[in-house]
Amino acid sequence: MTVTRPVSASLAKAFFYIVLLSILSTGIALLTLTSSLRDAEAINVAGSLRMQSYRLGYDLQSQSPQLNAHRQLFQQALNSPALQNLNAWYVPQAVKSRYGRLHANWLEMNARLIDGDLNWYQSNINNYVDQIDLFVLALQHYAERKVMLVFGISLAGGIGIFTLVFFT
């Protein structure tokens, strides 16, 4: 039996790769989780847009003096920091496009609210709420994919470490 290199060198090399794999998998997992910090807030804000849309219709129908205040609250929710973060480069295009459609349709809805066009609003509110629902669903799927990514990275790191420990 011939030893080609010292055991300490093999152990040092294996230890180095184990530490490197641990740092890489942990770092990527932490970056992914950091990008998830506002996911729940974004889903809650997006979901609240549904209720606010119906409230605006009620305000319009009842000629409520609260209509302008509620329009401003809707605008603030639509432009909240949690939703504005969805314009980042790493957010899937499906989420960005649904958010963009909500914005574009809000401009029309807001103009109709200002004009007091109740018939138009009643005819279009269900479609707008359906768009909100699809947006919330896209956000939920995006958040779930990030969790699965963290799981996959952690699993790959664990398998890599296991391989190094038992085959080095």
Model-inferred region functions:
Residues T2-A9, L31, S35-R38, F135-A138, ...:
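Juxtamembrane loop-transmembrane helix junctions in multi-pass integral membrane proteins
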Residues R5-L33, I159-F167:
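Extreme N-terminal signal-anchor transmembrane helix of membrane signaling/transducer proteins, especially
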Residues A12-F15, R38-N44, W89-R98:
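A ubiquitous short alpha-helical element
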Residues A14-Y17, I43-A46, I153-I159:
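Alpha-helical transmembrane segments
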Residues T32-L60, S64, N68-Q72:
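Juxtamembrane membrane-water interface segments immediately C-terminal to a transmembrane helix
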Residues A40, K146-L164:
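Interfacial "cap-and-anchor" motif at the non-cytosolic start of specific transmembrane alpha-helices
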Residues I43, S48, Q52-D59, R98-G152:
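Extracytoplasmic
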Residues Y58-R112:
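Extracytoplasmic ligand-binding sensor domains of the Cache superfamily
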